Amino acid sequence: MKNYHDIVLALAGVCQSAKLVHQLATESRADSDTFLTALNSLFITQPQRIEDVFGGEVRHLKLGLETLIHQLNAQGDQNLTRYWLSLLALEGKLSKNSDAKQTLGNRISRLKEQEIHYARDSETMLSIMANIYSDIISPLGKKIHILGSPDYLRQELVQNKIRAVLLAGIRSAVLWKQMGGTKWQILFFRRKLLATAKQIYSSIY
């Protein structure tokens, strides 16, 4: 039997990354706690439970759950829809490419080693994360076209933050697949996903 609770949390992680990308592209900034939750997820590679990936508590996925609920209600921004569905598509490409998976694992391991020297949200670490996305994930499929303010999108730091968040979105998409998530559920079990998302969201204080 599918564990829809865990599937929804992972999918909320994907949607949270999509929302952060939108914020960065249109405002050049994102909610700092939510942004850190996304970055931190890249460093939790052996969680005991799915909540551990997102700071140990579902409240850290509040923005993602809100976004997912709007999306499942067909009330969401079309760009957000494109972002999170593109992340799921890229995860599908990644799962079929053993070389890319191995390289990604190696690069994430090296990323974790850099924690000794740099804060996770430092410009150096953001650049490393962005390069991992550009080198490994981006070539796997159709590039995600980000819409926003040209002035912001030209800034290297904003570009790096967006790519780092997209990498975190891939992390959540991998987790979604591991939890038993499928695209068929989004098509045929939307009500179940929506009800579960609302139930989890209502538990956040």
UniProtKB/Swiss-Prot annotation:
GO terms for cellular component: cytoplasm; plasma membrane. It comes from the Bacteria. Disulfide bonds: none annotated. Gene3D superfamilies: HflD-like (1.10.3890.10). It is found in: Cytoplasm; Cell inner membrane. It holds the Pfam family DUF489. Keywords: Cell inner membrane, Cell membrane, Cytoplasm, Membrane. It is a peripheral membrane protein. NCBIfam families: PRK00218.1-2, PRK00218.1-4. Belongs to the HflD family. This is High frequency lysogenization protein HflD homolog.
